[in-house]
Regions:
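Noncatalytic N-terminal accessory/assembly modules of large enzymes
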Residues: 1-2
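Extended effector regions of multi-domain proteins
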Residues: 7-254, 262, 266-275, 282-527
Length: 527
C-alpha cells in the first residue's frame, strides 16, 4: 500500500511547471494498492493541534513561495569568481574495466565504481603505494519524522534502500554543480524492466583550494613557510523527491580522506490550520507545516590499513590524580582500549574518545606505535523514536556512533538488503549481535553521523546547505607530516591580484612589498 501526500500548483500560475507545490499541501491523502494500482481509500489529514479529523473544506489559496531564479529579485553586485587551472588538472583517470575508472592524484590511487543503491563507491584506496581502504561507500540513510499522528507516524524514508543513490543521481552540468577543470564519469544502470539505463555525468571530479594546509612563521627572522591545502573531490548529487544530497569524497595532500554530505532541497511539508503551532514541527509558510525529522547516515569503511588484518581501538584522555609526581594537578594521560568483539560503540565527548582503525603488526619506525587511521565524525543525536517502534527496529544503524563487525560477504547495507516495509533484524545491529571476534581480523567499521533537523523558516522554500563531514586521518602512519613536500605557496605560482579600493579587480599581479603585501615563502632558502 502506498500512502500518498498531495499538493497543487499555484492556481494563479498553474502553467508554471516548476512552481513550488510544497507550499500548497492538500488535506486529503489517497491510499493506493501496489497490487491493483487502485485507490483503496482516502484519508483526511489532521491539521490541528491533535489528531482530530475535520471535514474537508474548500481549499484556501495561499500566496506562492517560489525558489526558481526568475521569481526572485536577483542580486546585481555579485562579480565572477572563476576557478582557472591554466595547465589543466593534476589528476589522471584511466579505465580498468568497461565501467570502472582508476584515479591517480598526489600519491593517491584508487578505483571508482557506481551502482544503483550506493551510487559512488571507492575501491583499493592507496597512498604512496600503501593500502588503506578496500572499499568505501555511503551504506545507508534514514529520515524518521516526528509527527506522532496517523498517517504521519509512518514517515521514515530510507533514501538509499527505498530509492537508491545511483538511480536518483543528477546529470551534473558544467559551471553549475562543479567548478574548475572538471572530469565527468558516467554510468550504466538498469531500469525496472532490466533494460540498460544510461546515467550521464553522475560523478564529477575536480580539484579545489581548501585554504592553508600548514604554515609557520619564524618570529625571530620573520620567515614564513606556507603551503595551500589542495583537495581532490569526487562528487555526486542525488534528488530524492523533495530533498537533495550533495555527496563527496575528498582527498588532501596530508593523507586524509573525508566524506562530506550537504543536505539541501525542499522540506517535506503538510497542511496546518492557520494561527496555530505544534511542538513537533515549524510553520514555514501560511498553512504549511514542516515536521521535525532526523537525517542519520551510515558510512561503510572496509579497511586494509597496511594490510587486511586490522583492529579498532579507542583513545580516552583522563586527568592524572594529584600525587608527588603531579603535585599541581595539571597532568593527564591518554589510554588506549581495544575493541575485541563485534558491537555498537559510542563517543564519550567528556573523555575525548577517538576511535582508530589500527594495524597492530606494523609499527611506526620513529615511535614504535601501531600505524592507524582515526575517525573524526560530527556529534549527532541518535534515533529519538522509541526502541519498540518500527522506526527504531528498521534503522539498525541509528543507535550507535560506531559499529564494528567481522567481514562477511553480502553485508553491505546497514539497514538491511530490503528496507521497503522492512521489520528489522537484517542489518548491522543484527550482524554485530553475533559477537564475533574483531581483534586483529578482517573487519568492517560503520560510522554513523547526522543531524536533527528542526526546521526554521529560513529553510523554506529551499534550504541552504547543511554540511556534515567525516574524516579519516593518519595516526602514526607516516614518519612526519606527509604534506611537507607540497610546493610552497608563492605569488609566482598562485597569480593572486590586488583589489582596488572600490573592490574592482586590478589587472596587475600583487607583488610582495606593495600595499596589502602578500605573505609567501621565500623562493630561495639557505638550507
Amino acid at each position: 500500500m502506498f500512502q500518498c501526500f498531495l499538493y497543487i500548483r499555484d492556481p494563479n500560475n498553474a502553467s508554471e511547471v516548476d512552481g513550488n507545490h510544497y507550499a500548497m499541501p492538500l488535506t486529503i491523502s489517497p491510499v493506493v494498492s501496489a497490487e491493483t494500482m487502485k485507490v483503496t481509500r482516502i484519508d483526511i489529514l489532521p491539521t490541528g493541534v491533535d489528531n482530530t479529523i475535520k471535514e474537508p473544506s474548500p481549499y484556501k489559496v495561499q500566496p506562492p513561495n517560489e525558489y526558481i531564479p526568475e521569481a526572485q529579485n536577483i542580486r546585481m553586485d555579485v562579480k565572477p569568481l572563476n576557478v582557472v587551472q591554466p595547465e589543466g588538472a593534476s589528476f589522471q583517470v584511466t579505465n580498468f574495466s568497461e565501467q570502472g575508472r582508476a584515479i591517480a592524484w598526489q600519491k593517491w590511487e584508487f578505483k571508482v565504481g557506481f551502482n544503483q543503491r550506493e551510487g559512488m563507491v571507492l575501491y583499493d584506496v592507496h597512498y604512496d603505494g600503501r593500502p588503506l581502504f578496500y572499499r568505501l561507500s555511503l551504506s545507508d540513510m534514514n529520515i524518521p519524522y516526528a509527527d506522532p499522528r496517523h498517517p504521519y507516524h509512518k514517515k521514515a524514508a530510507f533514501d538509499l534502500g527505498d530509492a537508491g543513490a545511483g538511480i536518483m543521481a543528477n546529470n551534473l552540468q558544467l559551471g553549475c554543480d562543479c567548478l574548475g577543470s572538471i572530469y565527468y564519469l558516467s554510468a550504466v544502470l538498469n531500469d525496472d524492466k532490466g533494460e540498460p539505463l544510461h546515467m550521464p555525468n553522475c560523478v564529477c571530479i575536480h580539484e579545489q583550494d581548501a585554504g592553508i594546509g600548514w604554515k609557520h612563521t619564524n618570529y625571530r627572522t620573520g620567515r614564513a613557510a606556507v603551503v595551500r591545502n589542495r583537495e581532490l573531490v569526487l562528487q555526486s548529487i542525488i534528488t530524492v523527491s523533495n530533498y537533495e544530497y550533495i555527496l563527496a569524497f575528498q582527498f588532501n595532500q596530508a593523507g586524509e580522506v573525508m566524506y562530506e554530505v550537504r543536505a539541501t532541497g525542499i522540506l517535506s511539508t503538510q497542511p496546518i490550520d492557520e494561527g496555530i503551532s505544534v511542538p513537533w514541527g515549524t510553520v514555514v509558510h501560511p498553512g504549511v507545516l514542516a515536521s521535525h525529522h532526523q537525517h542519520i547516515f551510515s558510512l561503510r569503511v572496509d579497511p586494509m590499513i597496511d594490510g587486511p588484518i586490522n583492529r579498532v581501538v579507542y583513545d580516552e584522555a583522563h586527568p592524572m590524580p594529584r600525587s608527588d609526581f603531579n603535585p599541581h594537578g595539571v597532568g593527564y594521560t591518554v589510554n588506549e582500549t581495544p575493541v575485541t568483539i563485534s558491537g555498537g560503540y559510542d563517543q564519550n565527548w567528556d573523555a575525548n574518545r577517538i576511535f582508530k582503525i589500527q594495524n597492530a603488526s606494523v609499527k611506526n619506525p620513529v615511535n614504535g606505535k601501531s600505524v592507524a587511521y582515526k575517525i573524526i565524525a560530527p556529534p549527532f543525536q541518535k534515533m529519538l523514536a522509541d526502541k519498540d517502534s518500527f522506526h527504531f527496529k528498521r534503522a539498525e544503524f541509528a543507535d550507535h556512533n560506531i559499529y564494528v563487525t567481522s567481514y562477511k560477504d553480502g553485508e553491505l547495507y546497514a539497514g538491511g538488503k530490503y528496507t521497503n516495509q522492512s521489520r528489522g533484524g537484517t542489518g548491522v545491529r543484527s550482524w554485530a549481535d553475533r559477537k564475533d571476534n574483531v581483534l586483529d581480523d578482517d573487519i568492517v567499521v560503520w560510522v554513523q553521523f547526522g543531524i536533527n533537523h528542526v526546521p526554521r523558516i529560513e529553510d523554506f522554500p529551499v534550504m541552504p546547505c547543511e554540511i556534515l563531514k567525516v574524516a579519516l586521518k593518519p595516526v602514526n602512519f607516516f614518519e612526519k607530516n606527509p604534506a611537507l613536500d607540497v610546493p610552497p605557496s608563492v605569488q609566482s605560482f598562485n597569480k593572486s591580484v590586488l583589489a582596488s579600493m572600490n573592490h574592482g579587480q586590478e589587472v596587475s599581479e600583487a607583488v610582495v612589498g606593495e600595499k596589502a603585501a602578500v605573505c609567501c615563502v621565500k623562493e630561495q632558502s639557505k638550507l
